């Protein structure tokens, strides 16, 4: 049998295959037949759209093919024929159909619309549905676009550790990694667990961010980025939080907060435009069935400049807007999703950088501003989501950094290597973190993070 042609190739290079005998392999999405002929919609995973296969009773196995259950896998040999009068641009007139694998008749994804809640219970099968085939194709293309954006600008891709002995965010919401017996762990004299007897000789956790390690490489290679899994033990059962997710974290040396925001804006626009160019069928599907204003919004983001406002100005806008919020607004609070969405969706009506946050609600490594109250930090807020990027200029002054750590009761011994970076040719540098899943939610219009992760990990859920 000849080598299979991808359905994607048939759609992208149709003229190369018209009126020729070809072979395709894929899974049956739909099948309808009569006594003399039938139609099969086949998808091979390479393209969002199916291809129609027409077969008739000249096939030796016509009756067997006519009764095949949905999701059975087949190979088809036939002629690709143009169908200008039909919905589809072409079809295959089958000469031979080979059954590769039969599906059971109780296959749960029949031809009807299923709720996302139900599809989460069959996460091992949901990539075969239209919505999730589109979602995970976009996820793949967006991941490639991120690498391409940074590689084209000579950034060094850096792999930071997943197991770490430090807490980058200082929040303490981390998953512990240990080989100690939980029933009978070795104890210190004060009765606490003696982690010196653990595998790594100290308390270790799954990383919440690769940023501190990334700074080491930025101060050697100038411009670097990380792209990998991170973990947060936050018991937040919301549509925006997951215990395991992916982060993109660039770090740039000889750069300040303004440079950081410029990089973030350029990267976001590049990735969105790349996905729009490479996944038009998928985005059209999302625009039709998930978020009817999606394409208009994405085009607006790509073509417009992002707004900028200080945290203090944002608080004043929220206090004067006359809108009743569930969470009161006052200077010093951490902005909630409802505040962020008001700013981006109702006031500015575009993506928005909020800068210069109070130091008390931000991490220890962010550069202290001259006012002594705020830090050179920024969050990028986008309509429909809220915060999607968090970044800052890093504190390069050793004495100021130590003072901040003392304020927050962080041990210098735990961060000795990070502090040492400030001794040997320190310079201003900056970076940000982008939650990859939130980016995919924004590009697709999907509203629940569980639906943009192949196998979501959330409180109480570790199935599959």
Curated annotation (Swiss-Prot):
| Substrates-to-products reaction catalysed | tRNA(Asn) + L-asparagine + ATP = L-asparaginyl-tRNA(Asn) + AMP + diphosphate + H(+)
> Top-level EC class, please?
ligase
Location(s), subcellular: Cytoplasm
Q: Which GO terms describe its molecular function?
A: asparagine-tRNA ligase activity; ATP binding; catalytic activity, acting on a protein; nucleic acid binding; transferase activity
Record InterPro entries? Aa-tRNA-synt_II (IPR004364), aa-tRNA-synth_II (IPR006195), aa-tRNA-synth_II/BPL/LPL (IPR045864), Asn-tRNA-ligase (IPR004522), Asp/Asn-tRNA-synth_IIb (IPR002312), NA-bd_OB-fold (IPR012340), NA-bd_OB_tRNA (IPR004365)
Q: Which residues cross the membrane?
A: none
Alphabetically list the UniProt keywords: Aminoacyl-tRNA synthetase, ATP-binding, Cytoplasm, Ligase, Nucleotide-binding, Protein biosynthesis
One GO cellular component this record assigns the protein to is: cytoplasm
Q: Which terms under GO biological process does the entry name?
A: asparaginyl-tRNA aminoacylation
Gene3D superfamilies from the UniProt entry: Bira Bifunctional Protein, Domain 2, Nucleic acid-binding proteins
Q: What is its EC number?
A: 6.1.1.22
Query: What is its quaternary makeup?
Result: Homodimer.
PANTHER family attached to this UniProt entry:
ASPARAGINE--TRNA LIGASE, MITOCHONDRIAL-RELATED, ASPARTYL/LYSYL-TRNA SYNTHETASE
Q: Which family does it belong to?
A: Belongs to the class-II aminoacyl-tRNA synthetase family.
Q: Which NCBIfam families match?
A: asnS (TIGR00457), PRK03932.1 (NF003037)
Report the protein name in the record.
Asparagine--tRNA ligase
**Organism field:** Clostridium beijerinckii (strain ATCC 51743 / NCIMB 8052)
Taxonomic path: Bacteria, Bacillati, Bacillota, Clostridia, Eubacteriales
